[in-house]
Regions:
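ATP-dependent adenylation/nucleotidyltransferase module used to activate substrates
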Residues: 1-157, 168, 178
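AMP-forming adenylation/ATP pyrophosphatase catalytic core
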Residues: 126-360
């Protein structure tokens, strides 16, 4: 019998993942990571995670399953590796994905450390993706979920071979409707609970307001400029803008203007037309490859530049310094620094990295 830690968010997915694991006969405990509570900033919304209600829901489910339940306090690590990184990225003109950082540094790093300390064998999560071992390649592979509408392989591209060897994703072969049916059948209190949709520490979606509250600093106004460098007006501070943004600029113009670039060095926000947002190539750093050791030779595949962005035909390769280059068959709109680019070969995740630059 192996021993599993069920990483429980309080939602229906991780609860059913835990149930399916328990039914295999393995010894299980449930654990919720205490990261950041919305109540700490006086906010409560239904479609976020990390609330006190979520902890109670997870505890209730564990009670029904007859397994022990724990709360691991990782709030200090969350502040350092997720919230601080989020703020720093915005202040440097990037648009980060904190959910990927949470997986990278908390769920599949800090939780792994706790797993080893407790002498457990593997971690179970409610992510919609699949892990399979390829005998020929002698490697673990990360694959898309059967339910395309819920696939979360994009936010797991950073997983290493060591981590994949100690992860179970029981929902990868199920559809969301099936998961809810299982939860209802077993009387789980969260069977019809909303999926979390917002960043847990910015539940109202106002990133600039959060950053100012978090740092205690007001954002510094600067210039809006066109693509030639001509001043068009004043902006409220670069943390208020992201690539492709059109609303809230406050600049009168004969044609629609979009945020085409953000320069933290000059504190300028570059505005242009829609065509200025399209680029054919990007570079990425912090690269992690899963299905292979390297991409020294160009490989034809598909790439996603955002979580909800459709996959696009492309060619990818690495230079000697390890930087990932991705060239698209068709120019892509609003390739954004700080977001992840994830590469797919069919339903297999090849790997990915953090977007650094884009090239026309």
């Amino acid at each position: 019998m192996r021993k599993a830690i069920i990483a429980m968010s309080g939602g229906v997915d991780s609860s059913v993942a835990g149930l399916l694991t328990k039914e295999t006969g393995d010894e299980c405990i449930g654990a919720t990571m205490k990261l950041f509570h919305n109540e700490d900033i006086g906010v409560k919304r239904e479609k976020t995670c990390c609330s006190l209600d979520d902890v109670e829901d997870a505890r209730n489910v564990c009670y029904r399953m007859g397994i022990r339940y724990y709360v691991f306090n990782f709030s200090e690590r969350f502040k350092e590796d997720v919230m601080d990184r989020f703020v720093d990225a915005y202040e440097h003109g990037s648009t980060p994905n904190p959910c990927i950082d949470c997986n990278r540094y908390l769920k599949f790093d800090k939780m792994f450390q706790r797993m080893r300390e407790l002498e457990y064998d593997y971690i179970v999560t409610g992510h919609y993706a699949r892990v399979e071992y390829d005998e020929e390649k002698n490697r673990y592979l990360l694959k898309k979920a059967v339910d395309d509408t819920k696939d979360q392989s994009y936010v797991l591209y950073m997983l290493t071979q060591e981590q994949l060897a100690h992860i179970s994703l029981p929902l990868g072969g199920l559809r969301k409707t099936e998961v809810r049916e299982i939860a209802e059948k077993h009387g789980f209190v969260n069977a019809r609970k909303h999926d979390s949709q917002d960043i847990c520490f910015v539940p109202d979606g106002d990133y600039a307001k959060f950053i100012e509250q978090y740092t205690g600093r007001k954002s510094i106004p600067g210039d809006f400029v066109d693509t030639e460098g001509n001043i068009l007006g004043k902006h409220k501070g670069i943390i208020h803008y992201t690539l492709g943004q059109r609303r809230g600029l406050g600049i009168p113009a004969a044609s629609r203007l979009y945020v085409c670039d953000i320069s933290p060095k000059t504190n300028q926000v570059v505005l242009g037309n829609n065509e200025d947002l399209f680029h054919s190539e990007l570079t990425a750093t912090k690269v992690n490859l899963i299905s292979c050791e390297s991409l020294k030779e160009p490989m034809r595949l598909k790439a996603k530049i955002r979580y909800r962005h459709p996959e696009q035909e492309a060619v990818a390769w690495q230079t000697e310094d390890g930087v990932l280059h991705v060239r698209f068959d068709k120019p892509q709109r609003a390739i954004t620094r700080g977001q992840a680019v994830v590469l797919y070969d069919g339903d297999i995740v090849v790997g990915g990295g953090v977007i650094e630059n884009c090239i026309k």
